[in-house]
A protein has these predicted regions:
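TPR repeat positional signature
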Residues: 3, 10, 29-30, 45, ...
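Conserved small-residue packing positions in alpha-helical repeats and bundles
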Residues: 7, 14-17, 34, 47, ...
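Hydrophobic/aromatic side-chain positions at a characteristic register within alpha-helices
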Residues: 11, 15-19, 25, 38, ...
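Alpha-helical linker/edge segments of TPR/alpha-solenoid repeat scaffolds
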Residues: 51-76, 208-213
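Extended alpha-helical scaffolding regions
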Residues: 83-137
């Protein structure tokens, strides 16, 4: 399928930003191109876009994870709050919607962050983690950090991986392929930092393209 000039322009801008390592600008343009291509059922075109998006988000993640600490956030998330690159653990009284706003505000200000949102401990002593997007809610439960006041980088990394794995488990392989594509896109909207979800989306787009032949 031939791309529209608008979609190709978005991809060109994304690729230019990628060359400049302007990862957040690249991400924004790849996302626009992905949404427009999905609207046209251009599955083959989406595969290339997803790969570009994966690279851009890897760049964002690399910059966000340079700082070797985890910042705990339990106060209001606002557009004017003090933000710097790094890892953020959003915790009560804040909720998943606050974590999503934090990601959105950081992108708007061109600040690379990685975000995990936790909920209160369960009776079993586990910590629920959550990620949300419109129409998508993903939850999992993990072991708490040894020191809840100072969660380690390793614990944070494990939490990011766990919520991504939980998202993958929500994808039913027996579901119609275009529905799976949309479900994975929703998961990526909630968890932009998970690389296996990008791989799964590309694979599912390939399946959709083959079915369309």
């Amino acid at each position: 399928m031939t791309r529209t000039k608008q979609i190709q322009g978005q991809i060109d801008r994304a690729l230019e930003a990628t060359r400049d390592e302007s990862w957040i600008v690249a991400e924004a343009n790849f996302l626009k191109a992905l949404a427009a291509s999905r609207g046209r059922n251009d599955w083959q075109g989406m595969i290339e876009i997803v790969e570009g998006l994966r690279v851009a988000r890897r760049g964002i993640r690399r910059k966000a994870l340079v700082r070797g600490t985890v910042r705990i956030l339990d106060e209001s998330v606002t557009e004017t709050m003090d933000l710097s690159p790094g890892r953020y653990l959003v915790q009560p009284p804040l909720v998943g919607a606050d974590a999503r706003r934090l990601i959105q505000f950081s992108r708007e200000r061109n600040i690379p962050v990685a975000v995990v949102c936790r909920e209160p401990r369960t009776r079993a002593g586990l910590i629920p983690i959550v990620a949300i997007a419109p129409g998508t809610t993903i939850r999992d439960q993990i072991q708490p950090p040894a020191n809840e006041a100072k969660p380690t980088v390793a614990w944070f990394k494990g939490a990011l991986e766990a919520i991504g794995e939980a998202a993958l488990e929500t994808i039913d392989p027996s579901e119609e392929v275009t529905r799976r594509v949309d479900r994975i896109i929703g998961c990526l909207d909630a968890i932009p930092d998970n690389e296996p979800l990008h791989v799964k989306l590309a694979e599912t787009c390939e399946e959709a393209a083959q079915n369309a032949v």
